[in-house]
Amino acid sequence: MKRLFLIILSMLTLTSCVDEVQFDNTPEGNMEALWKIIDEHYCFLDYKAETIGLDWNEVHARYRGKLNKNMTSPQLQEVLCNMLAELQDGHVNLYTAADVGRYWAWKEGYPSNLNDEIRESYLGNDYRIAAGLYYRILDDNVGYIVYHSFSSGIGEGNIAEVLHHLRLCSGLIIDVRGNGGGQLDYAQRLASHFTNERILVGYRSYKTGTGHSDFSELSPEYLEPSTTIRWQKPAIVLTNRGCYSATNTFVRDMLCCPNVRTLGDSTGGGGGMPFTSELPNGWLVRFSACPQFDKEKQHIEFGISPTIPCELKTEDVLKGKDTLIETARELLGKR
């Protein structure tokens, strides 16, 4: 991860140190600076022109007309946040002293396919906790792991202890619904326990210039097998629209592992490595700087479809049951 960050930093530095334009600390200057940062360094402009019809030049003209020199900071923030929302990217944020501008439509407006209270009932009161992993053996001898956030650290020892405890189970459910991401290292560390060999899981590319199409050749990404205990039985990963960023990458990687399927809804996406830049007034903008792809060289920015589509049914919720968990248990029981 540190090496990846340094590569991104060097690419952004190389593409921004020539003929750098200095903008005034005015509403117009800050808007122009923000638009230019995205125009030269955001990694999905061409892709989103194709998929959602984004025209970044048209966006510039439209939002430039919303400015006036006497507008307040909250008014400017609203205009700039609305402009950034045109990118439809949850990795894009505007940080000010008063608020964080954000885009959450990647999960809002979709069924959550998750009832937290019911999920907690499956864990019960006697579940185990290994760092960020909550786990237990269900009464049909299926192992069940909940990982709420990849911001919660896990070590090799934690994962090994969990899998050792679940070793006699007939199968394993890994529930990452609602996991909005975190550290890629933790996502890759967990996935490494589900392959016995080095496998290709996807690709990444880097900006090499200020043009929308200025990218390096695709660089392959591999998943290395863990040197400790590795899971050899069927496993199902439960997903929903709340799976974003590092969780999106985790799902991508797990789909490349033998004996692993995903069940639920499409993930929320988030297929770009984020980077941060500063506006003249000191506000910070975070944006996607280099894109990730799956092993078929397809974008994962707008999410990954499940192997087995499944929705949380209202009639099951009324019975205190989770349709996704019950379906996964049934499938694992047949293997």
Predicted feature residues:
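C-terminal "post-core" interaction segments
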Residues: 18-39, 74, 141-142, 171, ...
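Flexible, low-complexity junctional segments that flank or bridge functional domains
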Residues: 4, 17-206, 213-219, 234, ...
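Sec-dependent N-terminal signal peptides
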Residues: 6-9
